[in-house]
Amino acid sequence: MRSKTFTTHRYGAAWTLALVMAWATPGARAAHDTDTIPQSVQAAMARANLPLQSLSVLVQPAGSGPAILSVAPKRAMNPASIAKLVTTSAGLDLLGPTYVWHTDFLTDGVIRNGHLRGNLYVRGGGDPKLVLERIEAIYAQLQAQGIRAIDGDMVLDNSAFALPKHEAGGFDGEALRPYNVQPDALLVNFKAVILRFVPQPHAGYATVEVEPAMAGLRVPKRVRLQGGRCGDWHQALRADFSNPRHYRLRGAYPRACGEQEWPVAYADPQAHAKRALLGLWQASGGQLRGTVRWGHVPAHATSLLRAPSLPLGEVIQDINKFSNNVMAQQLFLTLSPQQPATFDGAQQTLAAWWRRTLPEQPLPKVINGSGLTRQGQLSAAALAALLQHNLRAPYAETFRQSLAIAGIDGTVKRVGHQRGEAALLGQAWLKTGTLRDVASVAGYVRNTQGQWLVVVGIINHEPARGGRAALMQLLAWAAQQPTPQARPH
């Protein structure tokens, strides 16, 4: 998967300074009870058939001052993906924004006349974003060392993580959705295959491009075009991705859709890295005489190349802006003190960090670091306290830039363009969460006075469909509220 290009909006130290000034700026006390749910939010929840009792909210000034809105803020709720804010905050605090993971390439042989006379070992270190173009660059470096052909095997080692057995699709039955991919110490391209459809109108078909090149996977090179609206083009293709050796497209692609991409979790997760790394090696012009297999790096192996990941400060942009589940879980496992890393170890590290950082707040229940669970627990008050803490942290700006900007990017790119949301456009830095029984949002909102607010809203109800619209109304309402004057001490 080609890595995304992020549009960054850098206010630098000026943003933090503005927050500090906002904390000290008195404002008029809001003319409403702090526990009264705004009418616009109530109306949106009514339209979605959501009971008001399913809502937990805390809206407060950044830094200090009385709450503007407080509705059951201490109730333990399933946060869904806003739990990623806990994971990324702990990662920044414990590892630092410049932290990198490493993928090691080693051998038990020698290089002679363009041949690696031995095995090539690839040892994963948990890199959350070992994607197509980075692997291509690594292979170019190996070839620059004189390796054109590997006479032995390509041996893959992912022993840095010890993970429980995972049933693909066990969470919600959607085994081929990339958000359900399990973490892996040697995670290649998010264990996904990307199909790109490019219409050729004069020829009457769309070409089908595949990334990454997957050894042993057959994919149709083209699919016929059809007229009409774009609509549900996924359904129109009548795709079958269940066979990890052969993808089938029995339908047609709507001409009106233009170019589109379809990311699919590979049906045989254990074989994904093997097929992808071999396919990319062959696509680079490299040869392999042996096979690709899982194994362990022997003690006597010598290093050929150590490939660093992107720094953590950049990685968390994917995690928070785009809510990448498997990347969040990779980071979470990195917090585990023991080797191989485990979820239990990561949970213990996170708990100890939380007790040091926010001792007055109840410990959240973070299962896997991503929020993709039915068992997670976190209160709006506790998350608001974390967001307040992060404003004073050395990594405040890095954390803020990892959040999606309303109307600009990430999961809230469309926010601010709907009726009643104009005040949010470019004025809210947010993380959202969605499960069938959860809708959630958390982050920073700048009100019409130019002052910053911390906002957390969580809805737990099955189904929670329509909850996001209610939470957007909450954010829009918050943006219109004056900051209450801090109480005298």
Say what each PLM segment does:
Residues 54-56, 113-187, 191, 200, ...:
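Mid-domain, small-residue-enriched loop/turn segments at the edges of structured enzyme/sensor domains
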Residues 12-23:
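Bacterial N-terminal signal peptides
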